């Protein structure tokens, strides 16, 4: 039994449980600024977006909805795609969450990953034939491996044998003929640090 005492000034535990069950406390964040009127919030957001769009049209004399230039102080002209830096026309990178999803999808049931071609100096002659067989990197999740730094380029080691996990056994137990001799482990001790008695 414990030596915990409940003072007379505090309510008993039974009364506390009953009070919580009857009237659950409302969340403070829900009522901090009053109830949310979703219709009004949507109207305000749409109005704000329209105002921003109109201000941008006036400032840049360009109709961003229809992608057409308007009359004004700026003169818009078309340019060739090749004359622009690459970042203006390359597709956007997938979000980091997409990398995690692609990594999970590219594993088969046994846990091994599909073959992923290596890019640039990392590729050797055996890996280059994979690049020729792949139709389009946008359709293939493995083609996004160079864009997703979290994906592995080769599968994890399949054999996690006892090579990596060494057991420190005493010589007496190993030379012993008993069936459990190989399962005894002993914590290694530093040589030379013996107690002086």
Curated annotation (Swiss-Prot):
A motif (Nuclear localization signal) lies at residues 153-169. The record marks 90 as: Required for interaction with NUP50. Its main location: nucleus. One of its GO terms (biological process) is negative regulation of cardiac muscle tissue regeneration. Residues 1-11, 104-113, 175-186 have a biased composition (Polar residues). Residues 51-91 are annotated as: Interaction with CDK2. Residues 14-25 have a biased composition (Basic and acidic residues). It comes from the Eukaryota. InterPro entries: CDI_dom (IPR003175), CDI_dom_sf (IPR044898). Residues 1-34, 86-197 are annotated as: Disordered. GO terms for cellular component: centrosome; ciliary basal body; Cul4A-RING E3 ubiquitin ligase complex; cytoplasm; cytosol; endosome; nucleoplasm; nucleus. The modification Phosphothreonine is found at residues 170, 187, 197. One of its GO terms (molecular function) is cyclin-dependent protein serine/threonine kinase inhibitor activity. Changing residue 10 to A: Loss of phosphorylation in G(0) phase. No change in cMYC-induced CDK2-mediated phosphorylation. Rapid dissociation from the cyclin E/CDK2 complex after induction by cMYC. Loss of protein stability in G(0) phase. Phosphorylated; phosphorylation occurs on serine, threonine and tyrosine residues. Phosphorylation on Ser-10 is the major site of phosphorylation in resting cells, takes place at the G(0)-G(1) phase and leads to protein stability. Phosphorylation on other sites is greatly enhanced by mitogens, growth factors, MYC and in certain cancer cell lines. The phosphorylated form found in the cytoplasm is inactivate. Phosphorylation on Thr-197 is required for interaction with 14-3-3 proteins. Phosphorylation on Thr-187, by CDK1 and CDK2 leads to protein ubiquitination and proteasomal degradation. The modification Phosphotyrosine is found at residues 74, 88-89. Gene3D superfamilies: p27. Belongs to the CDI family. Forms a ternary complex composed of CCNE1, CDK2 and CDKN1B. Interacts directly with CCNE1; the interaction is inhibited by CDK2-dependent phosphorylation on Thr-187. Interacts with COPS5, subunit of the COP9 signalosome complex; the interaction leads to CDKN1B degradation. Interacts with NUP50; the interaction leads to nuclear import and degradation of phosphorylated CDKN1B. Interacts with CCND1 and SNX6. A peptide sequence containing only AA 28-79 retains substantial Kip1 cyclin A/CDK2 inhibitory activity. This is Cyclin-dependent kinase inhibitor 1B. It comes from Mus musculus (Mouse). The gene is Cdkn1b.
